[in-house]
Amino acid sequence: MSEPFKGTINVDIRDSVPDWSPFEPPRAPDAAPSVVYIVLDDVGFSAMGCYGGPIQTPNIDRIAAQGVRYTQWHTTALCSPTRSCLLTGRNHTRNSMACITEAAVGFPNASGTIPPENGMLPEILGEAGWNTYMVGKWHLCPTIM
């Protein structure tokens, strides 16, 4: 169903008001929160201060106090499968990431390439109007590619 025209059409174009809303890209709501994922390798769950650990992490603690902390996520002990889980919300074997990408063997659930139909969080956020940015090592493509 098409949206009703929200502009005004008068006798003269100078007195008319166009409606560009059907052609505008999606935008995140004005009060939408920022989403920040921080992924670290080789850090135990309880190592940082915000989780009761012995390492002093005042900046991370401050971010954690103002945001949401996830304590019931499943990740793996390997970087590629963990990143694929965080990006898609799916189990690493559903993402064909049974191991790190250098060890991908090309068999089902172990090809080292995330199937496009799994979708990724940046795509979903982008469709809803958020801008996304990634920096750092991702390790999500086999070396043969």
Question: What does each model-identified segment do?
Answer:
Residues 1-145:
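Formylglycine-dependent sulfatase
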